[in-house]
């Protein structure tokens, strides 16, 4: 379905953006970039989970099974595992700098899987349909297209809001011993 396709695309885009910030963190050694990547990972992981879960619920009546080892499903599951690995590694190491470097490797290596997820329906004979919305038009009824557009806007607003709230939390957690953070805490501005 188009809604599930949008969730697939969102998880892939979030992973690519996360990998970019991982790369920037390694190249520039700026502390902010890994914090942004760490803030994106849980939302991307949630989107990956939602795509797999709702896809399996849709797949049961459509394919007769909750799970089939389809190229799109399998590559999306691998991307979900990359998200889980990133989050687990980030939380397993109390030294933020070391965790950021190790997570950057996962972020950069995992981005190789993104084109596989995206192009799997074109490269292999899969159970998934091709794109419903293309440059040449849409195969979706206009009423459903509007509903899809509203859902996409809502999900993106949610994604931005949650990511920025999480980024604020990560910054304050990592910088809690810095003078500026302590002064803001004393003023009650946190």
Regions found by a protein language model. Name each.
Residues 9-21, 78-90, 146-164:
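Hydrophobic cores of alpha-helical transmembrane segments in multi-pass inner/ER membrane proteins
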Residues 5, 123-157, 179-190:
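Membrane-interface transmembrane-helix boundary segments in multi-pass integral membrane proteins
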Residues 1-8:
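Short, small-residue-biased leader/transition segments that mark boundaries at the very start
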Residues 29-46, 66-69, 94-108:
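Membrane-interfacial loop-to-helix junctions in multi-pass inner-membrane proteins
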Residues 43-88:
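Membrane-interface helix-loop-helix modules in multi-pass inner-membrane proteins
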Residues 161-175:
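Membrane-interface capping segments at transmembrane-helix boundaries
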Residues 103-119:
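Hydrophobic alpha-helical membrane-insertion segments
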Residues 9-59:
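A glycine-rich, hydrophobic loop/mini-helix early in the fold
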């Amino acid at each position: 379905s188009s809604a599930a396709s949008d969730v697939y695309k969102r998880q892939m885009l979030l992973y690519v953006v996360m990998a970019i910030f991982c790369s920037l963190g390694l190249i520039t050694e700026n502390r902010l970039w890994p914090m942004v990547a760490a803030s994106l990972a849980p939302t991307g992981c949630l989107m990956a989970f939602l795509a797999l879960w709702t896809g399996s619920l849709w797949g049961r009546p459509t394919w007769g099974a909750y799970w089939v080892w389809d190229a799109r499903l399998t590559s999306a599951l691998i991307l979900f595992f990359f998200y889980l690995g990133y989050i687990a590694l980030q939380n397993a190491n109390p030294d933020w700098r070391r965790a950021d470097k190790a997570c950057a490797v996962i972020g950069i290596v995992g981005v190789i899987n993104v084109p596989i997820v995206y192009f799997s329906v074109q490269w292999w004979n899969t159970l998934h349909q091709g794109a419903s919305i293309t440059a040449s038009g849409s195969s979706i009824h206009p009423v459903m297209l509007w509903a899809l557009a509203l859902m996409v806007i809502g999900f993106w607003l949610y994604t931005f809001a949650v990511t920025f709230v999480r980024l604020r939390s990560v910054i304050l957690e990592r910088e809690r011993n810095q003078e500026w953070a302590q002064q803001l805490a004393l003023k009650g501005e946190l």
